[in-house]
């Protein structure tokens, strides 16, 4: 992960045996198939965070999540275009980029502009700022779900109080 004056840059890479991804539209329930996920909680004073998911087929889900006492629902961005839209690309290693293909892995690179993160507070981050965050991978090889997480949470990825911490260093 890198950051600039305009947004955040991510590159996520994972090994995989089978490309379990069939959804061909954005803003679907991508987490039910192979996916990388990023959660950004920019201000601990408010239980609202940003969630971004990307599938091997380059489909995405970008939502703002208010989470009050474990009750949460994602809100889609309004005017998700131009400078507010992410820039993204995915690639597959060792096989074709198609549903159920045998592969060796896949990677995603994407840019999340700060304009998309508004109205969250503490955006853009200043030098020394701290955000809470988590990074996840869902994999469904052999019909079974396997998941990885950067900061251990629990039953739900939405246990934001257990997210890890990012500190933004100077340039």
What are these model-derived regions, one by one?
Residues 1-171:
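Structural preference for beta-rich elements and adjacent junctions enriched in aromatics
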């Amino acid at each position: 992960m890198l950051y600039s004056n305009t947004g955040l840059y991510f590159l996520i890479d994972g090994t995989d045996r089978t490309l379990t991804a069939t959804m061909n539209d954005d803003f679907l329930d991508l987490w039910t198939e192979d996916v990388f996920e990023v959660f950004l909680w920019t201000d601990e004073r408010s239980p609202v965070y940003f969630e971004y998911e990307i599938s091997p087929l380059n489909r995405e889900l970008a939502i703002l999540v208010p989470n009050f006492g474990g009750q949460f629902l994602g809100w889609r961005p309004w005017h998700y275009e131009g400078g507010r839209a992410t820039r993204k690309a995915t690639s597959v290693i060792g096989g074709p980029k198609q549903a159920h293909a045998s592969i060796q892995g896949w990677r995603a690179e994407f840019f999340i502009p700060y304009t998309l993160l508004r109205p969250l507070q503490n955006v853009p981050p200043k030098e020394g700022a701290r955000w809470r965050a988590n990074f996840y991978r869902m994999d469904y090889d052999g019909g079974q779900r396997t998941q990885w997480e950067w900061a251990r949470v629990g039953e739900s990825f939405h246990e934001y109080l257990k997210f890890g911490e990012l500190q933004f260093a100077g340039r």
